[in-house]
Amino acid sequence: MQRFPDPLRRHPVTLPDGSPHRLTVFLKAAIDHPNIEVGDYAYASAFEEVEDWAACLAPYLYPGAPERLAIGRFAQIAAGVRFITASAYHPMGGVSAFPFRIFDPAQMQHYRGECAARGDTVIGPDVWIGHGARVMAGVTVGAGAIIGAEAVVTRDVPPYAVVAGNPARVVRMRFGP
């Protein structure tokens, strides 16, 4: 009888020679970031070894940011996927899109407020995210959804939807009515 590996084991795949496949990780064991929550058995893969999975997947999410990233149980994340969290955005309502506020500690609180307004990014359980996809800030991806390779997800994805494209659109549902 096959057993599930320990969800806290960093490298869950064992190669035929007995060595761990270092390019696939259970994220719960690989990410230590105060703004990222990961469910059991969620995994990610890469084409080369990754030292900092939090920075790889969510490069703009800094500790203390007002937003968070939640990745559900059994989520599957392919190489090159990025979560573009709210801290990556630039102001667009003024004369310049340059983020002056991030360089002035006295103004940082205003920037944090703008980021918080976009909300958290939530990936439901059993979601499969294809190679190179981008998931933008504040998006919720429903349980069992599939995101196609290189898709740019700018809106919420319903449970069990298959989405593709830029911007991502529902191309079908995994299960019929």
Identify the residue ranges that each predicted region occupies.
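Extended, small-residue-rich solenoid/repeat segments and analogous flexible loops
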Residues: 1-36
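Flexible, glycine/small-residue-enriched loop-and-beta-strand segment within the central core
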Residues: 26, 36, 43-137, 174-175
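Short clusters of hydrophobic/aromatic residues that line enzyme substrate/ligand-binding pockets
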Residues: 31, 95, 171
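Beta-rich strand-turn-strand
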Residues: 117, 132-145, 151-154
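Short, intrinsically disordered, charge-balanced linker/junction segments flanking boundaries
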Residues: 169-177
